[in-house]
Amino acid sequence: MTRLYLATAYAQQVVPNLDSPENEKTAQMAIDGFEQVLKKNPNEVTPIKQIAALYFDLQKFDLAKQWQMKVLQAQPKDAEAAYTIGVIDWTVAYKNATKALNSVGLQDNGEGNPKMPKKICNEIKTENTDLVNEGMQYLQQAVNLRPNYDDAMQYLNLMYRRKADFACGNKAEIQADLAQAQDWVNKAMDARKANEAKANSRVTQGVVMGK
């Protein structure tokens, strides 16, 4: 347990998205510690989750996704792991799309980017099709596991907006994807309201119980 506590202490010092040698060194010390724990206890999920989170904080998305997959292997019903894989896929797809659009002086409009040249559309389709398909699969899995998972629903909205890029300006296809996106926005809002009502109910019950 001492090794786990030490690795956790290092992990708590890591600053998300900070690209510096010191931050990376601290993260690597934490990762090394968690991997030592896994050598003795291969089925312990906590260090697997910690390593996945550290790679995400370092923006090493391929490694973060690999470790989240390991979380799901150990705990197939872990909704947060499935959600995080979807977030990673969207993040990479978004970066790919904005980079391609910026190369021809365009900004992402989040609605299929109908003004982009065919060449750029094909480039985005090539880079992002697998990411969007996989991301949707895991985000849907997260919602299936946790029906009121409003964050996962919001990312499904964002994923459909990335999928709309693949229409290459076809208005009907773009509108179909944007309709799906809006549907997930509505579902997310309903889920959030339900979650807030449930949380408020617990607080109220706690106050009554405490009297």
Predicted regions and their residues:
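Amphipathic alpha-helical protein-interaction segments enriched in hydrophobic
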Residues: Y83, D150-M159
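Helical anchoring/docking segments at protein termini
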Residues: A53, A197-K211
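Short coil/linker segments at helix-helix boundaries
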Residues: A9-Q36, D57, I88-Q141, R162-D190
